[in-house]
Regions:
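Short strand-coil-strand connectors
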Residues: 44, 79-83, 106
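Short acidic-glycine-tyrosine-enriched beta hairpin
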Residues: 81-97
């Protein structure tokens, strides 16, 4: 179950597309406000999510799940406790489970995220 946080428009429990459907990521991403996050589809035991982000998220971690980020447009800085990872279009990064991280989108950023089904995007 997603945590309720009014700063972010996050609704990952509903899967928007089933298998054997065309997914128009550009059209979906164009229609939403900053820090919008939805599950596009399920692939086996994982969710593929689309995030439209701008500005700061918050420090958080996922105790039992790794988190994969792939930037499609914009720039996403992921601050870790010991460094900052800069993701621009075509770049990807895996935040290992249990690692504190602070995503910051420098301007409007669109990214795909892949995580275990049932993830709470706001952290544990």
């Amino acid at each position: 179950m997603d945590k309720v946080d009014t700063r972010y428009d996050i609704g990952t429990e509903t899967i928007l597309h089933e298998g054997n459907e065309l997914i128009d990521i550009s059209a979906i991403a164009a229609a939403h406000a900053p820090w919008w996050n939805r599950t596009l589809c399920a692939v086996n035991d994982t969710w593929v999510r689309l995030g439209v982000m701008e500005g700061d998220f918050h420090w958080h971690k996922h105790d039992d799940q790794d988190e994969f980020f792939f930037v499609l447009e914009g720039r996403l800085d992921i601050e870790l406790e010991d460094r900052t990872v800069v993701l621009e279009p075509g770049k990807a990064f895996v935040v290992p489970r249990g690692v504190m991280h602070f995503p910051h989108a420098r301007g409007r950023t669109v990214a795909l995220m892949v995580e275990q089904a049932g993830v709470v995007p706001t952290g544990d």
